[in-house]
Every structure is written in structure tokens, then in C-alpha cells.
Amino acid sequence: DIRPSRGLGDVYKRQAHNFHSTHKHMPPGYLGEDPLAASFNVFRYRAQNVGVLTFLLPFMEQQNMFDRISQEVNLNLDIFGVDNTVVPPAQPWWRGAQSFTMAQNQMGMFMCPSTNIKEGRITGALIGTWGRPNSNSGTMGLAGFGGATGRALGKTNYLGCAGGLGNVNPTNAWARYKGVFGNRTDYNFGAMTDGSSNVFAFGEVTGSLSRKQRTWVHGWLGCGIMPTAWGLPVKRDDQRWYRFGSDHPTQVQFCMGDGSVQKFRTQDGTGSGRWGKYIPISAMQDDNTPSLD
């Protein structure tokens, strides 16, 4: 295991803010298929599928780990699809031997002490969202490894907030609710026009529970984002891989764009409440800033 957790705020405020200071923008939420594509299939594996936490490694004294990944997987935001003609090749991270080895590091700083995600049976290797052009519909997908491989892969309790459904096609109604982190995004603080203190940046995830057994969990190298379209779990048995969630009773912790950590009541993230508060706070440019109280 590498370094114990200092909590959600440390991952975002210290590491992502340092990334922004160096690069003048936030890291991408993940490197997925073309976000403007006319169709979506998470199982096509046509992208690097590297998530936001990987880009933060150099800012948490893990430059060597980042270098070993980037030697095998091209992390250029502008190279879409699989391209073996570039150096390094644009390929899914798990096709690189070094990258696959690095992904098995159990990163203590990405884990919440309140949740035992190491018991998960299947570890997500990539996650992505998509919105159908000229509509109000969309979807998300997760693919991962089970068995001994899934147990060996490093896991995370923290993911970047994609807003309602991520940075979908601008003709999709969900585009209004895009968040700080998305598919190949490079937003800066100025993009948070709702105010950095009013926008979710990172949040807690637990994976899925089925009959009190943790099934799907999220791998830190490939899983980068979580949308808010599917609300929050009201009770522990409602925890799912497609929602933020925590094992803290009745609440989920989020790190806001300014680095402050706020507790959000789970009952405010379901039913009509998600439209009144949860989804608007997850969006950074929807001109709606409801109170966290």
C-alpha cells in the first residue's frame, strides 16, 4: 500500500489545485471515446481509458509511477481512438505491461477508511458517459476485471464529478449540467461560472452492494468520473457503481471547486430533490446555485 488516506480534500485541494497551478487547467476526467460520437459502447475499448487520478500522480510524489504509465499509453487529450502509429501508442491502459503492474498498487490516499472497498469482487477498469445528439437521453457504462485480477487492482473511493451526465454533445439537454471533470476536458477555474465554492469537484464512491456483499468497485487508474443523473443512495443497500455514495450514515462528502469539503444529505439527492439541489450543485455553468444547507 502507498501512503494512508488524508481524506477527500487532500486529493482535490492539494493535488488537483497543484495540477492547475502547473498546467493552468484541471486534468481531464478521463480519456474516453470521442464525446461527440454518434454512438457509444463502453466495451469497444477504443480509447486510452485513463482517469483523472492518474494525472495527479506527479503531484503526490509518484512521478515514477506516472512515467511508467505514460511510457506505454499516450495521454494526449487530442488523440482519439486506438492509434498504434503514435509514440507511445494510444491504447487502453491495460494493454501495457507496465501500466497494468502500476494499476495494482493499492493507493492509500485514494481510499476512505470508513469503507472496505478491497472486498469488491469486480474492479472497474474504465467508466464513461454519453448523451445522444438532439435529445434528452444518455447513458453511462463501466467495464472491469473480476476474479484474482479484479482483487489485485488498486481501488478508489474518490472520483471526479462529471455533473449531470458529463460533457455530452451540446445538442443534448444534459449538456447544460456538465461538471468540472469530463471526457477529455481541460477546464480551468474560470469555467466554474457558478462559483467554485458552489460546485462539486470530487465525491465519495463505494461501488455496488448486493445482499450486503460488495460487488463492483472502482479502479483508480481507469475510473475517473461519476455523474449525478442517477441520484444518491438513500440507504446503504442502495449503493451502486453508477452513483456517488458513502458508508457515512445519511450523508456523502464532496469536495467543492474551492477545495472545501461539504457533507451532502442523501435524501437531497433523490426524487424531486435531485433537481432542486443535487444536480444543480454538480453542474458548474447552469446558473443555479442552491444552498448546501
Where are these regions (language model features)?
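Single conserved hydrophobic/aromatic residue that forms the stacking wall/gate
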Residues: 1-12
